[in-house]
């Protein structure tokens, strides 16, 4: 997504978020600020997928200068470089990490990609335990113990079934992961085998087989939902890591223990009794 600009004619000048901006030619995947009636923020999104560009105007509480901020009405004035152009911008950057445009662009991509991995990872940590507690047997269900099964005498059976993939070599798994993930990431960043120009964060095309981004209004809202759930998933994964170190149990078992005896099974009780290495 390119830098936010005021939508106006070539060579003219117009105002957006209290600043005068010279109009330049819009680029693909561009979010254009358009002044709405009665001071309401209206956004125009341009979505390019190698086909004809589609533009849509949306009134959204998540974009623009009048968007929802991190402390609501008590947030104060957000930094000038956080204009509400991108999804998940709540006007909070006390460390100034977004002040440099190039660093900001890099960090945006890193956050979205890590959010997606965290959402998949959180599901992978929780779902096997849920199945195991409901009588479905497919090998080790605790997420941080499952991978170690490959070092056992019988190796690792995917989903607990030797008919699927029976893995006995950590090097073979590593090689497959590098090849498969490297190919997909290369496709995403380079724009496909023909090098078509795409947005590396939201490439669309084969990465959107259900056509969820076909409607620009819905696409803008989905971006916000994705980053919000992704941030929650990253915190969840951090919590799972801490739980594994402190309790030696998976998240579902920890939850069950807490519900059964909340007085003796809680963060404070574990923190005060935790001894590293034991």
UniProtKB/Swiss-Prot annotation:
Parts of the chain that traverse the membrane: 112-132, 164-184, 232-252
Binding site for chlorophyll b 5: 177, 274
Binding site for chlorophyll a 2: 114
GO molecular function, one term: chlorophyll binding
Residues bound to chlorophyll b 2: 116, 165, 194
Chain positions with N2-acetylarginine modification: 46
Segment annotated as transit peptide: 1-45
Membrane topology, from the record: Multi-pass membrane protein
Annotated residues for binding of chlorophyll a 5: 225, 243
PANTHER family, alphabetized: CHLOROPHYLL A/B BINDING PROTEIN
Oligomeric form and interacting partners: The LHC complex consists of chlorophyll a-b binding proteins.
Family note: Belongs to the light-harvesting chlorophyll a/b-binding (LHC) protein family.
Protein name per the record: Chlorophyll a-b binding protein type 2 member 1A, chloroplastic
Source organism (scientific name): Pinus sylvestris (Scotch pine)
């Amino acid at each position: 997504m390119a830098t936010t600009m005021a939508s106006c004619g070539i060579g003219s000048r117009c105002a957006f978020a209290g600043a005068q901006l010279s109009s330049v030619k819009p680029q693909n995947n561009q979010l254009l600020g358009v002044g709405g009636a009665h001071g309401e923020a209206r956004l125009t999104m341009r979505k390019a997928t190698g086909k004809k560009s589609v533009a849509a105007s949306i009134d959204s509480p998540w974009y623009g200068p009048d968007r929802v901020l991190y402390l609501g009405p008590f947030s104060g004035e957000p930094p000038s470089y956080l204009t509400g152009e991108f999804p998940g911008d709540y006007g909070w950057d006390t460390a100034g990490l977004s002040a440099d445009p190039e660093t900001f662009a890099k960090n945006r991509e890193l956050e979205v990609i890590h959010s997606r991995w965290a959402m998949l990872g959180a599901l992978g940590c929780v779902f096997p335990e849920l199945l195991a507690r409901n009588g479905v047997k497919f090998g080790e269900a605790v997420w941080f113990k499952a991978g170690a099964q490959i070092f056992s005498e019988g190796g690792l059976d995917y989903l607990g079934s030797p008919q699927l993939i029976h893995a006995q070599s950590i090097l073979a798994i590593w090689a497959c992961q590098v090849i498969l993930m490297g190919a997909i990431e290369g496709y995403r960043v380079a724009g496909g085998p023909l090098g078509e120009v795409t947005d590396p964060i939201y490439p669309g095309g084969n990465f959107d087989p259900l056509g969820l981004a076909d409607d620009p209004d819905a696409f803008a809202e989905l971006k916000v939902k994705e980053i919000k759930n992704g941030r929650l998933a990253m915190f969840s994964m951090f919590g799972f890591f801490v739980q594994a170190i402190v309790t030696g149990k998976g998240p579902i078992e920890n939850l069950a223990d807490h519900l059964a005896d909340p007085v003796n099974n809680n963060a404070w009780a574990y923190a005060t009794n935790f001894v590293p290495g034991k």
